[in-house]
């Protein structure tokens, strides 16, 4: 049981007459003591807590958060809307203030995330619905298809060479071209090709 007599804001800070402020403070204390006599103990309750954790966004911050949690034994679902993790840091050449190679910094982190037994990667995915309560949320995640079998793709890039359709590169923000089926970028994670379904001849014709 607890009750606060706020003698700082209501006495000390607002009155210049110390004697009268002291009388008021004593009255507030007596009132708080009298009130707490009528309080009922809150007690304690136990609630179920889901120890699985969802991290939305697999940029540098999301990856670090996932690794910290996974290393502490939590199972982490890492949701990323793009085909690869890494975020905008994978697009940078150098990083301030150390002028380090950006990919040299982020690539080991990406691989560590991908190989961590407590992290489940969900790429091409977005959260579409949440429900539940603190400690026990339920989340619906929409996963878009790659149209490539991840168990068979080796990331060799031969499919990209054979594809006849050229499109602006999403990774390079349209500054160059890629193919309708492509590896998002060098050293991407997961290193699996993805097909742009809106321009692929096979998918659009069927």
Regions found by a protein language model. Give the residues of each.
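A structural motif corresponding to the C-terminal end of an alpha-helix
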Residues: 112-120
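Non-heme iron-sulfur electron-transfer modules
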Residues: 1-7, 40-45, 82-108, 122-152, ...
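C-terminal boundary of histidine-terminating zinc-finger modules
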Residues: 17
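C-type cytochrome heme c attachment motif
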Residues: 77, 155-162
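Residue-level detector of alpha-helix initiation sites
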Residues: 59-61, 84, 158
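N-terminal Rossmann-like FAD-binding beta1-loop-alpha1 element of flavoenzymes
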Residues: 52-78
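A short, basic/flexible loop-to-alpha-helix module at the beginning of a structural domain
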Residues: 34-51
């Amino acid at each position: 049981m607890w009750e606060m007599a706020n003698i700082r804001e209501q006495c000390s800070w607002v009155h210049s007459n110390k004697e009268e402020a002291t009388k008021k403070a004593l009255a507030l204390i007596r009132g708080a003591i009298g009130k707490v006599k009528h309080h009922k103990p809150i007690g304690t309750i136990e609630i179920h807590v889901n120890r699985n954790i969802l991290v939305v966004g697999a940029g540098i911050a999301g990856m670090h958060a996932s690794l910290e949690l996974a290393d502490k034994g939590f199972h982490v679902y890492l949701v990323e809307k793009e085909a690869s993790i890494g975020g905008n840091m994978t697009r940078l050449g150098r990083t301030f203030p150390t002028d380090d190679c950006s990919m040299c910094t982020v690539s080991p982190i990406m691989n560590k995330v991908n190989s961590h037994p407590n992290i489940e990667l969900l790429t091409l995915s977005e959260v579409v619905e949440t429900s539940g309560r603190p400690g026990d949320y339920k989340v619906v995640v929409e996963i878009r298809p790659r149209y490539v079998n991840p168990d068979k793709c080796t990331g060799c890039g031969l499919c990209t060479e054979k594809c006849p359709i050229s499109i602006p590169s999403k990774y390079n923000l349209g500054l160059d071209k890629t193919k309708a089926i492509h590896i998002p970028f060098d050293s991407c994670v997961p290193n699996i090709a993805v097909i742009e379904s809106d321009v692929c001849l096979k998918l659009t014709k069927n």
